[in-house]
């Protein structure tokens, strides 16, 4: 009974996000889940959980799920949204990552950079399974719709 009530509350939160982001699977916008950006190379994450979350927001992840990608890769991916994932492992790099992206002339025409659609979120927030996924969904939704 308690579990059903909690599940219902979580579903209401998901439905509220879906209502704000009506789009069909045909017109999904490009998002990139990125990590470890150092102004020359970067890594990406790609998993079914995060893809599903992005789909609820009208996006698809253009990431390849690999590392050592170049700025040219980033330009050709043309993301409209970049979700930069911070972690303890990359703490020093993460501090300046989004600033470096925004100031890099090579990236000035990347839609997410041009339109200031780069957000940061911690690895634990975005990658953990369970109810925290809905917290992440809401956080990304708030950023996308601000």
Language-model-derived ranges and their functions:
Residues 4, 8, 44-48, 68-69, ...:
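Soluble non-cytosolic domains of exported or imported proteins
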Residues 2-57:
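Basic- and aromatic-lined ligand-binding clefts that recognize polyanionic substrates
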Residues 55-69:
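Interaction modules related to DNA damage response and DNA replication/repair
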Residues 30-35, 62-63, 82-85, 118-121:
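Structural recognition of the beta-strand scaffold that forms the well-ordered cores
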Residues 85-146:
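Structured C-terminal subdomain patch of bacterial secreted/periplasmic proteins
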Residues 71-84:
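Proline-aspartate-enriched helix->loop->beta-strand connector
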Residues 19, 68-73, 101-107:
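Alpha-helical scaffolding within the catalytic cores
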Residues 23-27, 75-77, 111-114:
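Extracellular/periplasmic catalytic domains that process cell-envelope and extracellular macromolecules
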């Amino acid at each position: 009974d308690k579990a059903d009530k909690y599940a219902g509350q979580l579903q209401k939160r998901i439905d509220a996000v879906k209502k704000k982001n009506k789009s069909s699977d045909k017109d999904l916008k490009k998002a990139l889940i990125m990590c470890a950006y150092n102004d020359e190379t970067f890594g990406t994450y790609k998993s079914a959980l995060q893809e599903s979350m992005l789909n609820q927001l009208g996006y698809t992840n253009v990431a390849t799920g690999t590392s050592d990608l170049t700025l040219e890769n980033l330009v050709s991916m043309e993301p409209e949204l970049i979700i930069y994932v911070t972690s303890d492992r990359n703490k020093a790099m993460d501090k300046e990552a989004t600033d470096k992206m925004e100031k890099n002339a090579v990236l000035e025409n990347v839609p997410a950079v041009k339109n200031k659609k780069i957000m940061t979120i911690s690895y634990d927030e975005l990658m953990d399974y369970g109810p925290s996924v809905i917290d992440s969904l809401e956080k990304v939704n708030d950023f996308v719709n601000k």
